[in-house]
């Protein structure tokens, strides 16, 4: 969500802070700001809206200094206006914060009773005043932060800059990620490796409860008990990553077109296409000893998990519960020690997913994760990690991360089926071959972009859209509806086609587009019956099917998008593309901010 950067450098820091903040734009934000020290004096610049507004402010009012902190804010407490933008400043310090201070009202009341004046509506300002209070008692900055951290309840990543001290940054983490970056004669703090990539490829991730004291020459890290600790130093996978749209209009479009390549990379990590077998060394779990699987995730990752539920149950004959993390963690589900708990997250930092993981871990379950960031907290706390090799995904609406999650879990379903004796070697080879063909089919779908874009002219003029699907096409319908909502702001709902008569059919009239995802599989005839019910009530059908399905539908449609005929097993991978492109081109026609849609964040690191 919010993005943090801190630099103790040797050069003018303001341009570097802004450059890092640009790399954090993908996380979502509504205001931004930076603070620096010049001759020991704190100064800051803030702006509502996009970073270009901050850059304009800095062009007119430069901010000198070689040490500073920066922030992109996604509003939680207080409106998205400049007054509430970070950094927050007192006479003694500046602070930036990602997260939520749950006891801020209590802290604020105490501090106001002491006569301290608050200028904002934010929870973060309470932290600034609390640490200032300790500094005014004569404590050093290190002592003041150390003594304040135990009084903060909630989730937070913090970075502090202190008046009069051009050799000191302090960071703290409880929940949202915070990384330390190592340079030559300079040090860095950042929300993730992407922010630090222009400056260093050598980083350490703080653990929950850690706080770090950075000087120009190094870092001292302390745990929640204030004991010195060392955290692993690693090379960032995102080193020298060029965050560029290339020849594409948006990152989302670029990332859609990267899918054949990144899916190939992900599949090759788990499957040997020469032998037609699963790479056992890449699995690391004995599925023959697993009697039940729970897959927990949020948002798009949850829909990937729900597709995977069908695969594991149908192919591996393994019972599966797919759960929304924010519900799972509170419903006190009975768990068996022979169950495997799997967690799916692009960032590996999703707050509710991480909390669910820790709940299962406390119950003694074996933990597996499917993540795109292998250095993330979820990955570090898992017994087995299954990476999705999607590369950095900048567009807030997930595309390639979703299909790479599907690719990884499809591979795991084959591995589980083989280990449990649900399929023989011949069937394993058939399924591996089918997956190996998926990138080729996806390339064919990408060539339909202009045709799909043409359909969106009508979609962009409506207020409501219904998506229908059966089997694995049902979670795709929900994902398609989510995509359209996220980036076009059109209200959309995804339903199981068989549920049409149980309520949604009341919405059907001549103004309602109904997008039907219907490959010509064993469920196709059932879905055709539902389409006939829609057509009989004047609904405007957009049918996504293959040639065989299009020829046998015998229904007038608003549009038919004809995809290649593919095996049922891989249809979710192939049919994901048109629903992404429908959402994308509808949003483009409506003029919305496709890569950074309103109110959304890429990485949801607070509950």
From Swiss-Prot:
Major enzyme class: transferase
Localization per Swiss-Prot or TrEMBL: Cytoplasm
Start and end residues of each Glutamine amidotransferase type-2 domain: 2-217
Name of a matching Pfam family: GATase_6
Enzyme Commission number(s) from the entry: 2.6.1.16
Active-site residue numbers: 2, 602
MF annotations from Gene Ontology: carbohydrate derivative binding; glutamine-fructose-6-phosphate transaminase (isomerizing) activity
GO biological process: carbohydrate metabolic process; fructose 6-phosphate metabolic process; protein N-linked glycosylation; UDP-N-acetylglucosamine metabolic process
InterPro entries reported in the protein's UniProt record: GATase_2_dom, GFAT, GFAT_N, GlmS/AgaS_SIS, GlmS/FrlB_SIS, Ntn_hydrolases_N, SIS_dom, SIS_dom_sf
Keywords: Aminotransferase, Cytoplasm, Glutamine amidotransferase, Repeat, Transferase
Functional description taken from the UniProt entry: Catalyzes the first step in hexosamine metabolism, converting fructose-6P into glucosamine-6P using glutamine as a nitrogen source.
Protein name: Glutamine--fructose-6-phosphate aminotransferase [isomerizing]
The organism's taxonomic lineage, starting at the top: Bacteria, Pseudomonadati, Pseudomonadota, Alphaproteobacteria, Hyphomicrobiales
